[in-house]
Regions:
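Small beta-barrel nucleic-acid-binding modules, principally OB-folds
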Residues: 64-79, 226-236
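Catalytic-pocket segment enriched in acidic/His residues
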Residues: 202, 209-253, 271
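Generic signature of intrinsically disordered, low-complexity segments enriched in small/polar residues
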Residues: 21-31, 44, 89, 109-112, ...
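HotDog/MaoC-like acyl-thioester-processing domains
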Residues: 1, 71, 76-166, 237-291
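Residue-level signal for alpha-helical context at structural boundaries
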Residues: 108, 191-195, 232
Length: 291
């Protein structure tokens, strides 16, 4: 495609206090002055100087062709702040032609978005898109094989002790997030659009919302910790009304620059269906945490 190395138009983004409150609500997170870690995804999506629809057109695809977010990673170099200006720069890092038994031929396109505040790096968001090269709607059935579970490690899970109760995906919050993301994809808003594309019979939850649920789980397991890295693979669709459950394990602890860091493997499931997310989170523990 000749896109690898292509630099995207730069731009800027800002999260106003009221938008920060709305984003916390859309991400099933208690409101607070510090933005949710996955707000970096939102700032990158809104701040890059090209719309999401035009980005997919650059890839030779339309929204209705079923482009999907397959993977996403967020690296936070410093805590995000509301009411702050962020410069956003982006580049297409790689393009790979692949084939799946489920969606046929597709292009795996990796884009990196760098956020700067006051000229200093603030966050890096790397998104991997699956762009189907079959007729419209084929890409919507994207799934990947889940990884193996690992036992015998410190266990994390969603539920009352980790996330304040069961998470049920709310279509109203999906609409709020569509506005905050400037995401025009109708499958997040309209069940008829999802059916028309052969996706599902209900609206489809946005990838960053599913990522935020995973982030909430690990943050609840370590009160007062700060999430500095979240790497996820989105394995299946989460639909409006779904109940989402999660779990994970602590796989490593280290002292870096005088701070204790915990690395966790995480996953999310929709009961009765396949696993929908697997990933890894790194948290910096508060100095008073003696676990």
């Amino acid at each position: 495609m000749g896109l690898a190395g292509h630099r995207l138009p730069p731009g800027s983004a800002r999260l106003e206090p009221y938008q920060n409150w709305l984003l916390h609500d859309a991400f099933y997170s208690p409101p607070g002055p510090e933005p949710h870690p996955v707000a970096a995804f939102v700032l990158a999506n809104r701040g890059i100087g090209i719309s999401l629809a035009d980005l997919f057109r650059l890839f030779g695809s339309e929204i209705d062709d079923g482009p999907l977010l397959a993977e996403s990673s967020i690296e936070l170099h410093r805590p995000l702040a509301e009411d702050a200006d962020y410069e956003v720069r982006g580049v297409v890092e790689s393009v790979e032609r692949r084939r799946s038994r489920r969606i046929g031929p597709f292009d795996r396109i990796t884009c990196r978005f760098d956020l700067f505040s006051g000229g200093a790096p603030a966050a890096t968001v790397t998104n991997v898109f699956a762009i189907p090269r079959e007729p419209k709607g084929r890409g919507a059935v994207w799934t990947e094989e889940r990884g193996t579970s690992d036992e015998g490690r410190q266990h994390l899970k969603s539920g009352p002790e980790a996330s304040g109760g069961e998470i049920r995906v709310d279509p109203a919050r999906m609409k709020t997030l569509a506005l905050l993301l400037a995401d025009p994809n109708p499958i997040h808003l309209d069940a008829a659009a999802a059916r028309r594309l052969g996706v599902a019979d209900r609206p489809v939850n946005q990838g960053p919302s599913t990522m935020a649920i995973a982030a909430n789980m690990v943050l609840a397991a370590f009160p007062g910790a700060r999430l500095v890295s979240l790497r996820t693979r989105l394995l299946g669709l989460v639909l409006a009304g779904d109940s989402v459950e999660g779990g994970g394990s602590v796989v490593d602890r280290e002292i870096l620059d005088g701070q204790e860091r915990v690395r966790c493997q995480v996953h999310l499931d929709v009961p009765g269906r396949d696993r929908v997310l697997e990933g890894e989170a790194v948290l910096v523990l508060p100095a008073s945490d003696n676990r």
